[in-house]
Amino acid sequence: MPQKEVTIPVPAKGGSNKEEDKKDNKDTEEKNTTTNTTTKDNKKDKKKDKKEETLSPEDEKLKNDLELLVERSRDEKEEIALAALEALKTEIRSSTSSMTSVPKPLKFLRNHYSTLVDIYKNSKEGKAKTSLADILSVLAMANGNDERDTLKYKLLGSGEAIASWGHEYVKHLATEIGVEYDIKKEENQSVEDLLKLVDEIVPFQMTHNAEPEACDLLLEVEQLSKIFQYIDENNYSRVCLYLFKCSYYVPGPDDINILKVCVEIYIKMKQYPDALRVAMKISDPELITEIFKLVENNKSILQQLGFLVARQKIVPDNFNYDSISDIINNSKLSEYFMNLATDLDIREPKLPEEIFQSHLDSTSAIADSARMNLASSFVNAFVNAGFGKDKLMTAEEDTKWWFKNRELGILSTVASTGMVVLWDIDGGLTKIDKFLYSQEKHCSNGALMAIGMLTSGIRSEMDPALSLLAEHINSSNTGTRISAIFGLGLAYAGTQRQDLMSLLSPCLDDDKEKMEFIGIVGLALGLIFIGSCDPELSTLFVQTLIQRGTAASESHARFLHLGLGLLYLGKQDAAELALETLKAIEGKGGEYARLTVEACAYAGTGNVLKVQNMLHFCSDGQENPHHGLAVLSIALIAMGEELGSDMCLRMFDHLLQKGNVHIKRAIPLALGLLSPSNPRIAIMDILSKLSHDNDPEVAQGAILSLGLIGAGTNNARIGGMLRALAVFYGKDVHLFFVRIAQGLLHLGKGTMTINPYHSDRTLMSPVAVGGLLALLHAGLDIKNILSTQSHYLFFSIVCSMYPRMLMTLDEDLKPLPVSVRVGQSVDIVGLAGKPKTITGFQTHTTPVLLGYNERAELATDDYIPLTNILEGIVILKPNPNASVTSPLASKKN
């Protein structure tokens, strides 16, 4: 196209007037601008012309043919119009079968969309009009308006199969159905026409690797139950995995309904272990019992379900399967753990000095020897936990180690024996027995606590903890009573035994005892009846808080509040009545109780509104000692949910900069709760900085949390940090916490975890959370509780301890070493096909240790696991279809 001529004016000669010069310059600038604009327009025109000219002969022909068909579609003769429309359909279908780029027919017809709409409006009723509606429905995808024309014209169309228009069309249609459904529901209009389309779309999506889209559509139109008729062997796992993850982002009670659909699908496909996991997630005892009934004739599956329930530390209601009672009771956990220790060659006991890797400076040892001996006792217990022997407390030659401690230090030192012999009832009781009848009261009290620790998570027909501890509940010595009651709380956490309620609940009414005793009674009852929502016990707690009045604000009263909160752990709306009742309690005690109950009720849910409530409480402008509890509550609510945890880190960063002293003291503890036994570098760096803070309580909390996030991992980086801190705080009270953290880091010589999440991080163990919360609530007043007389509360962590192993057994429950691949787990939610679930794997022979983010899969096809998640104790059965070259097949032949 020829460029337009532009005339540039020549300025007149002569005349030096400034105003005229300015005027001339202005005119020149305007003309130059006009010239530039004209040149740009010319360039655009040239590009446009060039683009039009570059159409290939085939494209040019297609464009002309389509324009001709559009023109003929307005023909008055229906036969001609219908033929033209059918030809248009053929052209569009041939291009929409693969939507890798914008199809050319849609591109060329886009400019004719309004023309076709006018033709439709002016057409008479008949086949031609409905056929044109089908075409308009497809073209509306490229139109880009918000009128939902794709759905509108689909409903007006001929009703032909949507599959013929391709996947992209179906996806677009499903999106518009979701929006239209909400609008019609608000206006109380019929949605039958939409549901008919849904019944057509869902089968198409389910058979074309689009299960997530099918689930989304059914969720939006509230018809999720229809998914059952489309489930088969090929798609059930992807559907359930997607629905399970969706439940995190759906408010109640819809989240429970989604999870129940998952359970029904798993039961339909006979995936009973997976069904049981989801039922435990819902925390529905009836559903759990029903699943057990379905497999009562299948011994191997029944045993595998028993191992899953034992890991969660719960007992199903009306349980009467004697054949697996040993499994449910965790009776053989010690045996399996010792097999792991033997295989890893780590049974030899370690001394605390081997963990410290440097002897204490002589001057500091003399200045605070009793305190450092106490620290060594804790470290010895943590490091040798579960191995049955150590070099300080259970050695054959009596070292009299406990004599090197003073008063309550003796209690904790003797109690540490229970952690060394953890889970081994037969062998452990004999090693504790020698302390039980000592004339030294602190020694015998420590033995009572040790018995409780020994049987934590283990059930036995002999019931040794109850028979040995019950007689001391009404002792005249308060220390003895506290030891026995705390021991019972650790031993029977999560059992919800009514005989223990009748035994312990009268202790709450004891007016003669101080708040420390009442607090420990409340904590023990909370641990035993964790998540039970027991109304009788809840009422008793509230009455005690009211009766105690101002004493309910004392430091140890926090454990009474925590006990009440634990009753509602994870129960969400079930805690509303208790929260309303607590509003009647005025003062700081009532406020602490309300915050604790609300946080416990929504533990691990990631509930954004509750997190906002806690943040709002922190920002009220007044310096409130309970701000620290609100910070800890944020971590409790967000834990276990990856996105929420990341958001918490950012919140805590802001709170560190702007918050008051109570907030700053709680943040290290909150970080420890957010990531136990999972040493994330971001958290590690924050805690490393805070461990040098000028406020001693901030520094001590940070040091303790370094131990919590690295617990049982032997993490080299944290180990280096703690050794440096031991030198830095060589003559300081902080050294006690450095030693505790070093002991936690090497928990069980690196074989245990305190993280409450298991089964590929999908299930939260309430008992494990309870143990962590007991320690962290004590940490909120670290100066007056953990640093002084109540250091025995460090042992509450025993409720959270569990071997982080994968052990494979045959159908006779004998160890069966097999090759497994262990690597970083990969999020495969919403991915089509069968993608890899791990990356960067290494091949090992079971038993093996698994890290927080690690997952395992069998590296051989000789066996089939009875559960899809290889974690903890897994039963394998021989694969009847094993390849001929495999060792198992050769052995059979």
From Swiss-Prot:
GO molecular function: enzyme regulator activity
One GO cellular component term noted in the UniProt record for this chain: nucleus
Keyword field contains Repeat: yes
Keywords for this protein: Proteasome, Repeat
Keyword Cytoplasm belongs to the record: no
PC repeats: 412-445, 446-482, 483-517, 522-555, 562-583, 666-700, 701-735
Annotated SUPFAM superfamilies: ARM repeat
Compositionally biased tracts (Basic and acidic residues): 16-32, 40-59
InterPro entries: 26S_Psome_Rpn1, ARM-like, ARM-type_fold, Proteasome/cyclosome_rpt, RPN1_C, RPN1_N
Signal peptide: none
Region (Disordered): 1-59
GO BP, one annotated term: proteasome-mediated ubiquitin-dependent protein catabolic process
Function text: Acts as a regulatory subunit of the 26 proteasome which is involved in the ATP-dependent degradation of ubiquitinated proteins.
Family: Belongs to the proteasome subunit S2 family.
PANTHER family attached to this UniProt entry: 26S PROTEASOME NON-ATPASE REGULATORY SUBUNIT, 26S PROTEASOME NON-ATPASE REGULATORY SUBUNIT 2
Protein name: 26S proteasome non-ATPase regulatory subunit 2
